[in-house]
Curated annotation (Swiss-Prot):
Gene responsible for this protein: tsf
Annotated protein name in UniProt: Elongation factor Ts
Taxonomic source organism: Chlorobium limicola (strain DSM 245 / NBRC 103803 / 6330)
Location in or out of the cell: Cytoplasm
Family of the protein in this entry: Belongs to the EF-Ts family.
Xref: PROSITE patterns: EF_TS_1, EF_TS_2
Single GO molecular function: translation elongation factor activity
CDD domains: UBA_EF-Ts
Ranges for region Involved in Mg(2+) ion dislocation from EF-Tu: 82-85
């Protein structure tokens, strides 16, 4: 058996990030050949990934990356098994590398990102393979649960990540004054994270869904013995409350509960003589 030096073990650890004992064993199994040892560890990572495939990856983080000009942004949820790993530099660094890769290549889905190749820091592996390698390195199953990409050539993209990186949001505004709209977009991203809207405005709520809700509210009111002449008023009131909960522009603004988000948008239009609308938003909460 070839003599394995401490320097070789250290070099392999620096390249792969795997523990010293595993690096030593890999070199021993590979007769001291560094490239074969790297391949050995990658295969071991893939085997461990297969072994842990049935494990549940419920911890992790929500990671976001924006372009410098705020014309593009990506948000993703990367899962692992324990909070200990989720808070570690290796995991958070890997999540950051994935967001950068997704943004640079305009990857719009997990499948598109998994097919891309990472840089030298991750052995130029495809993300799909790198996930298995990271499983071997961290000893936990990793899962790229979801991803969204916003491109705003005629607007601005902003984000908000709650401390702890378990909740994040991405917002796209369509506006002819993108430089002035940065703060507004940031505020709306915070609104989305805090208030969890489902749609941007009333028109986005399907009419058939509203009719179903209306009938449910009607039957509830009748079941409670409400007089027929008051039922429609009760139903309308409950629908308004529903809109205020799920429609972004109908929600009370988190920075001033006396006004709605729609008022904030109107104020921006008047102040800057500008057009602005919420083009899209995404809210990710870990484990949802």
């Amino acid at each position: 058996m070839s003599q394995i030096s401490a320097k070789d073990v250290k070099d392999l650890r620096d390249i792969t990030g795997v523990g010293m004992m595993d690096c030593k064993k890999a070199l021993e199994e590979s007769a001291g050949d560094m490239q074969k040892a790297i391949e050995y560890l990658r295969k071991k990572g893939a085997a461990l990934a297969a072994k842990r495939a049935e494990k549940e990856a419920r911890e992790g983080m929500v990671a976001i990356r924006l372009s410098e000009d705020r014309k593009a942004g990506v948000i993703l949820e990367l899962n692992c098994e324990t909070d200990f790993v989720a808070r570690g530099a290796v995991f958070t660094g890997f999540a950051g590398a994935l967001t950068s890769l997704a943004l640079d290549n305009a990857a719009a889905s997990p499948e598109e990102l998994l097919a891309l190749s990472l840089g030298e820091e991750y052995g130029n592996e495809k993300v799909d393979d790198a996930m298995k390698t990271m499983t071997g390195r961290l000893g936990e199953k990793l899962e790229l649960k979801r991803l969204a990409l916003f491109l705003a050539p005629d607007g601005v993209v902003e984000s908000y990540v709650h401390p702890g990186a378990q909740l994040g949001s991405l917002v796209q505004l369509a506006t002819d004054k993108p430089e002035e709209a940065g703060v507004l977009a940031r505020d709306i991203a915070m609104q989305v994270a805090a208030a969890s809207p489902i749609v941007a405005d009333r028109s986005a709520v399907p009419a058939d869904y509203i009719e179903k809700e209306r009938e449910i509210y009607r039957q509830q009111a009748l079941g409670q013995g409400k007089p027929e002449q008051f039922v429609e008023k009760i139903v309308t009131g409950r629908l308004e409350k529903y809109y205020q909960e799920v429609v972004l522009t109908e929600q009370s603004f988190i920075k001033d509960g006396n006004i709605k988000v729609s008022d904030v948008l109107s104020d921006f239009r008047k102040k800057h003589q500008a057009q602005v609308d919420v083009k899209g938003f995404v809210r990710y909460q870990l484990g949802e």
